[in-house]
């Protein structure tokens, strides 16, 4: 985890992330900051960063249970990609969606 975020950390925890091409679900340690969403292979100091998502490039986050037919899932949408995640329970799902959505709204306000 050498690329530690320098921004304010808002939430950390394990989420399952759906892979882009094979649509496999892999457990990732995620870190949400006020500017990024990071996904790592684990919590070890040398864990690989598998995703760095700049929140200013995101347009929305929403629950995705109906779309994916999987409990506690949500999506983070950019102009050209959709990232899917699965939380352990409804509370975690709501926490992640709310915190990411708050940051997206904050990014919009900062632009004006």
Regions found by a protein language model. Give the residues of each.
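Polybasic phosphoinositide-binding surfaces of eukaryotic membrane-targeting domains
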Residues: 7-51, 96
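Short, surface-exposed loop motifs enriched in S/T, G, D/E and P with embedded aromatic residues
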Residues: 15, 58-60
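Eukaryotic intrinsically disordered, low-complexity regulatory regions enriched in serine/proline/threonine
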Residues: 1-12, 44-45, 62, 67-73, ...
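Canonical pleckstrin homology
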Residues: 21-27, 60-112
